[in-house]
Amino acid sequence: VSMMVGSDRIQVPEVSSGNIVALTGVRSAAAGVTITLDEDSTPFEAIRHYSEPVVTVAVEPKSMKDLPKFIDALRTLGKADASLQVSTNQETGEALLAGMGELHLEITVYRLEEEQGIKVTVSEPIVVYRESISSDNNGRSFEGKSPNRHNRFYIETEPLPDDVTNALREGVFGDGPVRLKDAKGVGDRFAELGMDKDLMRKIYAINGTNVMVNDTKGIQNLHETRELIIEGFNDVCKKGPVADEPLMGVMVRLVDAKLHEDAIHRGPAQTIPAVRNAIKGALLRSKSVIFEPIQKIRIDAPNDVIGGVTREVTTRRGVIEDMPVDGNTASVIGTMPVAESFGFSNDIRAATQGRAVWNTENAGYVHLPPSLFGSVTAEIRERKGLKQEIPGEAHYTD
């Protein structure tokens, strides 16, 4: 145990509250955890990050001899930076870094190379989009059949109101399966935001900004497949039917089911794909939309080069919301799609002879313009090794 005094670390027997403490020997600790010797103590409230990673790059060491060190370094970075997501591409084995933007990932790569001494190869940045829907199924449920044809699930989907989606994003309702004994209380909290109380009291699970509810009546043996149904729901939340991108702001309703009486015929290999297909088919039956991440941006520059600033912003599908002037300096304030922000730092320096100062902040997601829907989804699907054409409902009927 040590106290931090400037950049110096002074070892002490104990540290009183209000000081900055340095601990060694707690390798498994990550940012935001509570360390205590009392097993019954209440942990500090978790640090909640409202911004989601919107840009991903694949990284790998240039020298395979650095691989063990590279893996350890990624674990360390993931613990120290809670806004950085570290994962592995199961098909290629590449390490994937997902962060708040291009600059965030550039800093992470810099730390890998300069602080850890590992030279890495980095892919082009990839934007993380979100799939959603803009309408319900008009009462037309979609039937999903199990591979053995003995089980059928009927699903309807509808978009969640924006205030409910935002509350889910902020973690108001928690995440994961909802225990039966907690469903009533969770449903009542949804009702406070205008949702149907009776329906939401039958909630099965929450996954990110999506919810699943059981809107069936008297289905025999349904409770035995509850966990498998939730697993199918979670699969679709990770990869939607349009472009295998995460789902956002959708309510999935199980409205009916026909189950084989013998449990051996409704196991995981039968139930999960049936539910997954039913949800994907229902989503396609609704009007599919893509959401893209955007950034708030502010650029300060001398008046004589502000024309170059506005030109750079507008050519990148940016929206200028305000242009205040203070003496010889003007500011451009607005929003810009993350997908259009790559290379912006170099271009804005060139447009202003290096005289601009700017900052960005994640601003959530907005609808991708309909004119770009086809080209963007085709590009995503091609990158992921999928057919460029989005499958129709019929793809999920068998």
What are these regions (language model features)?
Residues V1-D398:
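Accessory interaction regions appended to the cores of large information-processing enzymes
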